[in-house]
């Protein structure tokens, strides 16, 4: 199960990033600036609908994503068959803690069978309450998830060191 993939996180505040020799990323986000970093790292992640799960009992939302590794340079010793650059994607897990509600907007009917392209995680204002926030996950084509949370507490962890891809995401502005 997805929930069994997570271990304990060392206590502390702020952004914590570690890279092991296999180049896998492990990051904890605790504030809005950290959330921006997580959003940048997850931009263009491909997520199967079946790989997202809200555990209301444990107040967490979990995702397994195939993220494009924007933070890594192209693979220097490798070209694709046309001589083009080769990039990397890594399988990663994302756990958003203290989630008390999930709201779907423009969500696909057959969402469990869908593959969604994550564009960004954004912090939205909390409507007239003394604590908490809303974290919005925006996907290509308009679907989004709004997670009501007690605080920003996100863990992102690569499961592997990455795999080559010759497809770099592009966006029309």
Region locations from a protein language model:
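Short, well-structured hydrophobic secondary-structure segments
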Residues: 44-103
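Short, low-complexity cationic-aromatic patches
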Residues: 49-62, 125-140
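Extreme N-terminal basic, low-complexity initiation segments
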Residues: 2-8
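Flexible glycine-rich active-site/ligand-binding loops centered on an Asp-His dyad
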Residues: 150-173
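Eukaryotic intrinsically disordered, low-complexity regulatory linkers and tails enriched in Ser/Thr/Pro
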Residues: 6, 14-44, 62, 112-114, ...
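Intrinsic, low-complexity N-terminal interaction/targeting segments
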Residues: 32-44, 101-137, 145, 149, ...
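Short, surface-exposed beta-strand/loop "edge" segments at domain boundaries and coil↔beta transitions
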Residues: 69-76, 141-149
């Amino acid at each position: 199960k997805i929930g069994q993939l997570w271990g304990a996180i060392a206590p502390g505040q702020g952004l914590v990033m570690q890279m092991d020799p296999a180049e896998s990323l492990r990051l904890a986000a605790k504030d809005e600036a950290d959330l921006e970093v997580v959003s940048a790292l997850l931009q263009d992640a491909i997520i199967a609908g079946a790989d997202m799960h809200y555990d209301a009992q444990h107040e967490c939302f979990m995702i397994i994503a195939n993220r494009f590794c924007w933070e890594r340079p192209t693979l220097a010793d490798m070209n694709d068959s046309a001589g083009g650059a080769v990039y990397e994607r890594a399988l990663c897990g994302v756990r958003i803690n203290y989630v008390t509600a999930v709201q779907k907007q423009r969500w696909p009917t057959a969402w469990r069978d869908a593959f969604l392209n994550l564009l960004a995680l954004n912090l939205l204002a909390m409507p007239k309450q003394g604590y908490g926030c809303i974290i919005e996950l925006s996907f290509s084509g308009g679907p989004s998830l709004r997670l009501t949370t007690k605080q920003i507490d996100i863990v992102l962890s690569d499961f592997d060191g990455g795999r080559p891809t010759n497809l770099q995401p592009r966006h029309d502005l």
